[in-house]
Design a protein with these regions (language model features):
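Non-catalytic C-terminal accessory region of glycerolipid acyltransferases
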Residues: 1-21, 25, 42, 88, ...
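Alpha-helix initiation/capping motif
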Residues: 5, 36, 76-80, 138-140
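A short, well-structured juxtamembrane/interface segment
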Residues: 21-43, 61-62
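Generic structural signal for residues positioned in beta-strands
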Residues: 31, 45, 74, 181-183
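Glycine-rich, highly charged phosphate/nucleotide-binding loops
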Residues: 31-33, 105-109
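Conserved beta-strand termini and adjacent loop/short-helix elements that scaffold enzyme active sites
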Residues: 35-37, 78, 100-103, 185-187
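Residues that cap or initiate secondary-structure elements
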Residues: 38, 52, 81, 131, ...
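Catalytic core of membrane glycerolipid acyltransferases/transacylases, capturing the structured
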Residues: 42-103, 148
């Protein structure tokens, strides 16, 4: 990302804290359920739809920082200005970022992800981000999992009452005092699958998680 002007730095700083405060205020009013889960000892690839980004830091806070014993994970985030705001917000939850995407900086992001995994860090990907189409799966998650022989896990949340933004990703923001179900799926292994078959398997895994979590 290019060097930021003073005006942009101020904008990002204000947006960063407003979003951080907003999601915490919503989260604290909600009834939240985290489905009991576990991850393998070795690193893995975790995927969730871009439209579930708003409240996903709380899944990291609960599982990676608490239940998994301060296990490390980093999220692949685009170099776009929206990605800069996201990077700043999630940093307050102790979440690191690997900058780049399938549209810009993709090769750099992939190499960064491989390096992090070899250092024992899980890599989290929004397969339809940063620009869509909605619920599409880019090549990165499949390539990463197959190259390093890693399992893939679907991370998801659904809310009993929510706002759905008119954005390409149909961002879901739970309403205050709603119920939120978080889940982390069983492992998916893509060994032997073609690129297209692997991408479709990830899609179906995420859809299955959404269907299950929507039962309140």
């Amino acid at each position: 990302m290019e060097k930021l002007s003073l005006k942009k730095r101020l904008f990002f700083r204000v947006a960063e804290y407003l979003i951080f405060i907003l999601i915490w205020c919503i989260f604290l009013t909600c009834r939240v359920k985290f489905t009991p889960t576990k991850l393998p000892e070795k690193p893995c690839v975790v995927v969730f739809w871009h439209g579930r980004l708003a409240m996903m830091s709380f899944a990291y806070r609960r599982w990676w920082l608490r239940d998994f014993g301060k296990r490390r994970a980093k999220v692949i985030i685009s170099d776009h200005k929206d990605g800069e705001i996201i990077t700043r917000v999630i940093s307050h939850f102790g979440i690191g970022a690997i900058r780049g995407s399938s549209f810009k900086g993709g090769a750099r992001a992939l190499m960064g992800a491989i390096k992090e995994i070899k250092n024992g860090t899980d890599v989290i990907i929004t397969p339809d981000g940063p620009r869509g189409p909605l619920h599409s799966v880019a090549d990165g998650a499949v390539i990463l999992a197959q190259r390093l022989n890693l399992d893939i896990y679907a991370l998801n949340y659904e809310a009993s009452s929510f706002w759905k933004f008119r954005s390409w990703d149909e961002m879901v923001l739970p309403k205050p005092f709603s119920r939120i179900n978080y889940s982390l799926s069983a492992p998916l292994n893509l060994t032997g699958l073609s690129l297209d078959a692997g991408k479709e398997a990830i899609r179906q895994l995420l859809f299955a998680s959404a269907e299950k979590d929507a039962k309140f």
